[in-house]
Amino acid sequence: ISASVWVESETGQTWWGKDSIVTISYTKKSYYYNYKYEPYTQNRYFIDTRDLDINGKYRLCVSIPGIGEYVTPFREVMIAQEIDSLSYRLGPDNSVMNLMLSSSGNEGQSKYYRWNYREDWENNPPIMPQVTYNYKDNSIGTLSYEVKDSLQKCMAFSHSYDILVYNTNQLSENRLENYLFLSFPTMDRRMVGLYCLTLYQTPLDREGYDFYKAMSVNDNLGGLYAPYPNEIMGNVLCTTNSNKVALGYVNVCTRSMKRIFIDGGKLNLIDR
């Protein structure tokens, strides 16, 4: 479905989105295989908002031919709370890796937080191949040192999937100290070598927090009495048909970022 997506200011300025068409062409001639990926469209749209005036008000607009027009309310730009630090702590018997954050908001900043992150780590294979098979002439060859070295130095990555939100309403200060946001076993492949986590923090208003909190409860529990997705109302409205329900919540804000590196190899947690 081809759609038009743009950000609109309260004064009428527009910033148009670009749909993502990813082209990957990859050919490996060292071995016997030949990979080629054709261009594809993911129906994702990117809007460069870096030059927007933070003192303005903005909304998201979507137009889908034959389906409808969708808009969000105009919102002021919320400034993200700074991430003061990222740290880690090993659990009992060094069996669990716990990642924690500390953050402090200034006077007037939101007390509602949302996070997402990206993980990158060295993914060295536990068993290295020594030979290769060429199906064209039915021959077996030996992998060179250069090839084995390139296979041994691999990287893997992952993104957060869980909805991570929190608020400081019950605290005396708008501050988080060593808040635990991620845990995983130290036996995990992520701890074999160098590990990097990049954390992104964005502020939410109360309505946005309630939306994501309801979504997280529905995602974690499910069950007979869990709310249906269309019962969790966001702030995306269809202006051409009020009976249509759009899922999602759009916030207007900046975001802060912090990165931590952990050398799992130097920790020597388990003899691998």
What is the predicted function of each stretch?
Residues 1-272:
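A sequence/structural signal for flexible, mid-protein segments enriched
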